């Protein structure tokens, strides 16, 4: 198997072919010997394949862009990708392969939250920098050595949206999430902050992402006193729930999260999703930022590299890419060097997703200032609430 010029190799998660693939990747030539290697564990198939495929496309495009301009510090970048099929057990096998090969200086952790949790601890113990492309709060609270989340965690999504719901008078919510990592983490985080924001949780529904009919669950919600349905899922069940929410004419407000901010979701639910409340980070609403905002410049660059609208998943990947690049430029292209730079030299680094702030005690990059909340109008997001979009007060 030959490696694509841009340095990204997608490998099927099949044990029979892995030795052959990695033998070809490891072949030594002058250009390969000087390359900087990363591993990427991604859900390219399975329930969260939209996440994994979007992550891979963003990594693919950005790495190609960097390599066409000299790579990082004059060295070509190579990202080897393994499919975990949205399965934490397969993710563990993938990450162990990256850990065992000393040429890999860092790992892009899975966009599947459960898989990221299962593998982040292993990478931490092995001493290899691991940046999850998903938002499992427990991975970084408390912080684990070498394990990071540069995108928003489920906790940050919850805090951002709870503040907005309070501001518009929503007090009673029904939580709904899939039985995966993100679908459980989100409702759990809302439960923890509910009292602070004056929220009453009427009930919580956890569902299988393989389900195709939610009419019974939605009818229960419709007949409740809940003012809003807050949905947590990045699976194909999301569009189904949105469509049935509209068909059953629920009177409640529909509340979505960044997991639903992608061209595929917005186009697939166009007409049904209009009016929904949603939140994300700055990469997905960069055109609304002031022209002087440095994040706008980085997000515009990402948009030009991708040649399509920026999704939440693109922002997840971009934050990790920008952080790894900054860490190598400020430190060294070694496992220890990258980790030291992440913990000590990345405060206020501008990425397409927002500014990231890391320290030895904080391994979550984005902060509340990089979040926005708004509505979906004409099948597009429109930010309404967030520090970056606040109009300066008149003196």
Short names for language-model regions:
Residues 1-37, 68, 389-395:
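Short, low-complexity disordered leader/linker segments with a strong preference
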